[in-house]
Amino acid sequence: MFKLLKRNKIFSALIIIAVLFMCMYCFDAVRAKTFEIEVISISPEMPVADGETPVEIKVRLTRSGKPVEGHYMFMIPLNGGTMQKNREKTDEDGYASYVYYPYRSSVLMPAQTVTLRVYDESNSIFVIVNAALDFDIELKEHT
């Protein structure tokens, strides 16, 4: 009988931990939806896939329409190219600036639309549920 009680205590503790984890995840998921990331500018608008020309990207993080200061934003190209720095901190107006270097187009990988993803790494409290935005940059062939 004591073995059964001991087993039930362990099982009950595991259920409580799982429910607690789910509650924390749900809290962070709802909280992440209150943050909005928007692309403010991409310069130049039609970058060349030459592997050298930098593309300046500026994003803004807001919460309920107000700028969010001091959050770490992380940007990564999903299908080609590199970032000068992946992680930037938002300023007092909620802005973060990045420099993206497109890949060099070739016969095997012609110029195409590149998708970049930016995350707000600082919006979660308990579990990592990041606010995120995917956006595209159309690359043109280098001459």
For each feature predicted by the language model, list its residue ranges.
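The feature marks long extracellular or luminal low-complexity segments
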Residues: 2-143
